[in-house]
Swiss-Prot record:
Cellular compartment(s): Cytoplasm
The EC number(s) this enzyme carries: 2.3.1.286
The species this protein was found in: Corynebacterium efficiens (strain DSM 44549 / YS-314 / AJ 12310 / JCM 11189 / NBRC 100395)
SUPFAM superfamilies, per the entry: DHS-like NAD/FAD-binding domain
Gene from which this protein is expressed: cobB1
Positions annotated as active site in the UniProt record: H120
Protein's recorded name: NAD-dependent protein deacetylase 1
Cofactor list: Zn(2+)
Binding locations of NAD(+): 24-44, 102-105, 224-226, 250-252, 268
UniProt entry keywords in alphabetical sequence: Cytoplasm, Metal-binding, NAD, Transferase, Zinc
Protein's job: NAD-dependent protein deacetylase which modulates the activities of several enzymes which are inactive in their acetylated form.
Length: 281
């Protein structure tokens, strides 16, 4: 679709109000976090972890936590960008009824979005697979820092190499010299970020909340997502079954491109600048 027509179509949806935004990794690239399918993304640097590996493969789990100890620092320092703040403005103006994000970086929350569902969780929390205890990631990081003095500073890190799930590729000798901390409650090292990994279902409470948001919306705008993961693609399918228009704003090809009402192939940040200007926000 021609850019002017796509912009006009998205603006009309927003002017009518009650729009549900669905966001993906492309929203956070301007914050310095590569998406999964970029040249530096994890699907090109090696596959992401699975739930089964966290639960049953101590070597893979140890490797992840060594890599994540380094990569999470970059994620924690990342700041919301203009797209995150644009979505906050649209929500405060009463044009967005809610946001469903597939991202686990917590940047929508930190930007101030209120009616928000983090479909795949948030890296800011960890969970013990042994006893179920949850705690803030920063508390685990403090224990890891105590057990691994000087570890982070000894590694030359390219921030652009950090994956959306918070880890970064490390040489084996760095992985081997890393010491893992245990659960604050039971001491088990069976820890996992409280996010949905491959082989793990989206919690039913989040599915229910997404269904409620979609039921109350008149349209859906997808931003920065190829919708390759079924949990995001399903929202588009359900919206269209209900006769609700769907727009996609994304820089690359996506799974739902052939079926949406408005397809705007462009960078997400500049697109939302144009949207806010058109709405006088």
């Amino acid at each position: 679709m021609e850019e002017g027509a796509a912009l006009e179509g998205v603006v009309k949806l927003l002017e009518a109000g009650s729009v549900l935004a669905v966001t993906g990794a492309g929203v956070s690239t301007d914050s310095g976090i590569p998406d999964y399918r970029s040249p530096r993304g994890s699907l090109n640097q090696g596959r992401p972890m699975t739930y089964q590996e966290f639960r049953f493969d101590p070597v893979a789990s140890h490797r992840y936590w060594a890599r994540s100890f380094v990569g999470w620092r970059v994620m924690a320092d990342a700041q919301p960008n203009r797209t995150h703040y644009a979505l906050v403005e649209l929500e405060r103006a009463g044009l967005l009824s809610g946001i469903v994000t597939q991202n686990v970086d917590g940047l929508h929350r930190r930007a101030g979005s209120e009616n928000l569902v983090a479909l795949h969780g948030d890296l800011a929390t960890i969970v013990c697979l042994q006893c179920g205890h949850r705690e803030a990631r920063e508390l685990l990081d403090a224990r890891l820092d105590h057990l691994n003095p000087g570890y982070f500073d000894s590694i030359a890190l390219d921030p652009s190499a950090v994956n959306p799930d918070g880890d970064v590729t490390l040489d084996d000798h760095h992985v081997q010299r890393f010491t893992m901390a245990g659960c604050a409650r039971c001491g088990s090292v069976l820890l996992k970020p409280d996010v949905v990994y491959f082989g793990e279902p989206v919690p039913s409470i989040r599915k229910t909340r997404v269904a409620q948001l979609l039921d109350g919306a008149d349209a859906v705008v997808v931003a920065g997502s190829s919708l390759a993961v079924m949990s995001g693609y399903r929202i588009v399918i359900e919206a269209q079954r209900a006769g609700k228009p769907v727009a996609v704003i994304n820089g690359g090809p996506g799974r739902a491109d052939h079926r949406v009402d408005i397809l705007w192939r462009t960078r997400v940040g500049p697109a939302f600048d144009q949207i806010l200007d058109a709405l006088d926000l």
